[in-house]
């Protein structure tokens, strides 16, 4: 071993994919939201190495649904794939049938898939 070998950096390992949740504020695009909603908030879950990658996947999925993304909320959720059920039971206990199960989540998110929380809609402001 040479004198400087101990200072060599270890090869960078690729980031492990985990479930990343990105909160989006959406508006009608080519498709209207159910009336009388002006917009909605939703959390989009995808497998990603970082929040930026997750935000891109999430926005693309929203556009494909016919909606526009007005805002990406900067704080992301990071959930280990094997802790999905624990996350759901602690965060979304009233929606057990809305989300894929622990056994189904990896397949649901494979190949760029995105899973959405329930949409929380809001009406236009009254003037």
Placement of each model-derived feature along the sequence:
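Long, contiguous binding/interaction regions
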Residues: 2-41, 52-65, 70-72, 76-127
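Short, well-ordered beta-strand elements within core beta-sheets of diverse protein domains
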Residues: 43-46
């Amino acid at each position: 071993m040479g004198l400087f070998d101990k200072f060599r950096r270890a090869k960078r390992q690729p980031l492990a994919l985990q479930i990343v949740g990105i909160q989006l504020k959406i508006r009608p695009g080519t498709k209207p939201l159910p009336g009388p909603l002006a917009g909605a908030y939703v959390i989009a879950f995808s497998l990603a190495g970082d929040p930026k990658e997750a935000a891109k996947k999430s926005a693309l999925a929203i556009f494909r649904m016919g909606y526009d993304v007005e805002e990406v909320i900067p704080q992301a959720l990071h959930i280990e794939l094997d802790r999905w059920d624990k996350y759901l039971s602690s965060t979304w206990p009233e929606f057990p049938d809305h989300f894929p199960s622990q056994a189904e989540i990896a397949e649901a998110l494979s190949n760029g898939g995105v899973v959405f929380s329930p949409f929380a809609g809001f009406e236009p402001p009254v003037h």
